[in-house]
Structure formats: C-alpha cells, structure tokens
Amino acid sequence: AVTTDSFVVNPLFFKGGNIGKLAVCGTVNDLLMRGATPKYLTSAFIIEEGAELNELKLIAAAMSSAAKEAGVIIVAGDTKDIEGNGGIYINTTGVGFIEGEDFASAKSEIGDAVIVSGSMGDHHAAILSHRMNIKNDITSDVAPLCDMVANLIKNGIEVHAMRDVTRGGLGTVLNELADASGKCFE
C-alpha cells in the first residue's frame, strides 16, 4: 500500500505535537487504516524564507521520534525554499505491506459497530485554542495508531473497515463508509 499526504498547519507547534509529528503520524495512520504495516516514509519540506532554523530542528526531531515509535524508516527527503513569511509545509509518502486483510471501506456490513480510538475533536480543538489564544488543557491526540491496530488484529477482532477521522470528522467518514459499501447508518 502507498499513500501520500501534504501537511499545512497553523500554528506549526501546538499542545501535543507539531507539524513534523503530525506528518509522520498522519501518513502512518493512513497506511494502518488499509490494514498495511507501515515500513517506509519519504518527506519533502517546502520552507518559506524566514523560517527559524531552531523550529526546523524541532520539527525534524519530532518526525524522527514519531517514526521510531511507529517502527518506520524515513528513507528519503527533499527541501525547497520559497518566498514567504516563515511557513513550513511537509509532504510525506508512506509505503506499507498488507499481510492479511485489506480494510477497504466497501467491506462495511450491516450490524458493524463503530468504534473510535478516543475522544473526538481534541486535535482540532488544541490547534484552534492556540490560534485564538484560548488557555485550556486540551492537548492534540496526534499519535501513530500502530499498537492499537495490532491489538485489534492480535485479539481476533473482525475488522471490516477502518478510517482516520482527522479529515472531515466522524459524519463525513460515516457517509463515505456508507457510500462505499452501499449501506446506510441509522
């Protein structure tokens, strides 16, 4: 399985992570949602003039740490400088191997349970809170879901489909699962 994604987040740093951790975890989790074991990542940075070197170092360190936690190797990278105001954008491509079942959206069945991995909305709430300078204890839950998915499989849980709810929210994901499988949610 192969997936690619671009990450543009403002602020670059937020409670619980930064754009580097988000890029690695997002790509790893996309592979996991297909039933693939993530193995390799590539990364390309687009860096606007004025970006802080210390921020780049922290972002790269977060990527390295997240890759190690997920058991993946970052095998290639690229950087491009562009005019701008210090923004940093990251594109990652991930490669993983499907050893068992491909968890395709079309495999959802009537009677399937919908299980979420944690509280909903923490990541976006943490980012929005930072943008709006709202003081609270909300922390992004950005993390590789390798152990969680491995435990589902190891414990014989019959998985038909998995999705990362990051983009579009739960309602969008449920609609996509229903459309792909020709079913509906009631």
Question: Language-model features: where?
Answer:
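Helix-biased detector of long, well-ordered alpha-helical tracts
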Residues: 1-186
